[in-house]
């Protein structure tokens, strides 16, 4: 994809070179790539340098419990048991993982989906706890982790695992609003007034 042909100036395409190892320690975010979002709405990719903070995005396909698909390279993992039985050659379903690093005063930001908190745990080398969420839509197995950056508490790291099998609530609301639009009497609709 040629960036100059990109119709959306806020979208950034990343190639396969930015994929990360899904089996790395969950506490090691130093190798992740994050998308940096300022409170003022200034979005952008910041090159990874020693003198600047890491603020890059990463998207990958990995083997895991959550369902979904991605357009990235699939990593396979063979499971084995140590109970004296034969090794299992089962390959788990593939999923998709994306991490965002956002400058924010609040921990959990509205991303258009409904989430149910199912856990919280202390993270090594970080005074802030990591929160775990599952998508509350029936049949959707997407999970997200939310935690404050250990180096700079002004940033929140949100990691999504999986792909939603449904539309976000904001898309449903927007589609209903557009469907109720009357081309002849657009001033009469309270949803479309500013």
Swiss-Prot record:
Classification via PANTHER family: WRKY TRANSCRIPTION FACTOR 51-RELATED, WRKY TRANSCRIPTION FACTOR PROTEIN 1-RELATED
Stretches for region Disordered: 58-97
DNA-binding region coordinates: 104-169
Known role: Transcription factor. Interacts specifically with the W box (5'-(T)TGAC[CT]-3'), a frequently occurring elicitor-responsive cis-acting element. Involved in defense responses. May act as positive regulator of salicylic acid (SA)-mediated signaling and negative regulator of jasmonic acid (JA)-mediated signaling.
Phenotype when the gene is knocked out: No visible phenotype under normal growth conditions.
Subunit relationships: Interacts with CAMBP25/VQ15.
GO BP of this protein: defense response to bacterium; defense response to fungus; jasmonic acid mediated signaling pathway
InterPro entries tied to this protein: WRKY_dom, WRKY_dom_sf, WRKY_plant
A Pfam family this chain is assigned to: WRKY
Biased composition (Basic and acidic residues): 76-96
Native species: Arabidopsis thaliana (Mouse-ear cress)
Family indicated by similarity: Belongs to the WRKY group II-c family.
SMART domains (alphabetical): WRKY
Location, primary (coarse class): nucleus
Identification of the protein by name: Probable WRKY transcription factor 51
Superkingdom per UniProt: Eukaryota
Localization of this protein: Nucleus
Gene Ontology annotations for the cellular component aspect, listed alphabetically: nucleus
UniProt keyword terms in alphabetical order: DNA-binding, Nucleus, Plant defense, Transcription, Transcription regulation
């Amino acid at each position: 994809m040629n960036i100059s042909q990109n119709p959306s100036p806020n979208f950034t395409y990343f190639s396969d070179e930015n994929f990360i190892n899904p089996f790395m320690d969950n506490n090691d975010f130093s190798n992740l790539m994050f998308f940096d979002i300022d409170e003022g709405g200034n979005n952008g990719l910041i090159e990874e340098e020693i003198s600047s903070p890491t603020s890059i995005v990463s998207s990958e396909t990995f083997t895991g419990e959550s369902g979904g698909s991605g357009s990235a390279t699939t990593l396979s993992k063979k499971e084995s048991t140590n109970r004296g039985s034969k090794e299992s050659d089962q390959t788990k379903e593939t999923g998709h993982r994306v991490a965002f690093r956002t400058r924010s005063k609040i921990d959990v930001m509205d991303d258009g989906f409904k989430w149910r908190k199912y856990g919280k745990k202390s993270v090594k080398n970080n005074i802030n706890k990591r929160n775990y969420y599952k998508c509350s839509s029936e049949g959707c197995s997407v999970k997200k982790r939310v935690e404050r950056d250990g180096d700079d508490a002004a940033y929140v790291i949100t990691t999504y695992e999986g792909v939603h099998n449904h539309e976000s609530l904001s898309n449903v609301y927007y589609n209903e609003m557009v469907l109720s639009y009357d081309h002849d009497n657009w001033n009469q609709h309270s949803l479309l007034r500013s």
